[in-house]
């Protein structure tokens, strides 16, 4: 997948090149507001990897593909693993294919937002629309098989087997479905 995925484009850069590139992006965004001179030291917040990810899923040639968009394209790269993710998320795209298979009955793609929590994976499916009672039961069974902490559809909880929690400082916080969370623990600590 390296070199094909839009998110991987800069991963091979040395730290100085990466720092200059990222700082340049921030300065360019702030320049129209006259604030680019206020950008100071670069703080690396990569940490041990991304703890949240949104995969894209669609049907292709009779199969389900789940992964990231190819750089400058709408094509989904079928993902087996990604070195930028925390270990808990490494094989999640592949593992979540049965959920996508239940929802992808047409060519309409869906998104699968996944957060690694201390209780297990918190999964929010997006792009499908309301689920019938029968589909909700099938999704619940699949969540059980996959040992998900929680499964929701556009923030509507299908099943919560364990409250998805993360540590923020000394507190253990239960996340609402589909909420924003800093991508890395190191980024949150800032």
Predicted regions and their residues:
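Accessory RNA-recognition modules of RNA-modification enzymes
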Residues: 1-190
């Amino acid at each position: 997948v390296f070199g094909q995925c839009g998110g991987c484009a800069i991963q091979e850069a040395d730290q100085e090149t990466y720092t200059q590139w990222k700082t340049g992006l921030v300065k360019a965004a702030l320049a129209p507001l006259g604030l680019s001179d206020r950008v100071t030291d670069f703080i690396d917040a990569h940490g041990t990897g991304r703890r949240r990810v949104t995969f894209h899923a669609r049907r292709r040639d009779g199969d389900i593909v789940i992964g990231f968009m190819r750089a400058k394209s709408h094509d989904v790269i079928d993902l087996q693993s990604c070195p930028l993710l925390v270990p808990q998320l490494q094989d999640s795209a592949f593992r979540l294919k049965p959920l996508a298979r239940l929802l992808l009955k047409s060519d309409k793609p869906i998104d699968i937002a996944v957060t690694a929590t201390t209780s297990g994976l918190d999964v929010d499916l997006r792009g499908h629309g309301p689920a019938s009672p029968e589909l909700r039961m099938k999704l619940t069974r699949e969540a059980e098989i996959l040992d998900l902490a929680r499964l929701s559809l556009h923030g509507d909880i299908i099943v919560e087997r364990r409250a998805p929690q993360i540590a923020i400082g000394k507190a253990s916080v239960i996340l609402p479905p589909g909420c924003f969370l800093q991508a890395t623990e190191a980024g949150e600590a800032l």
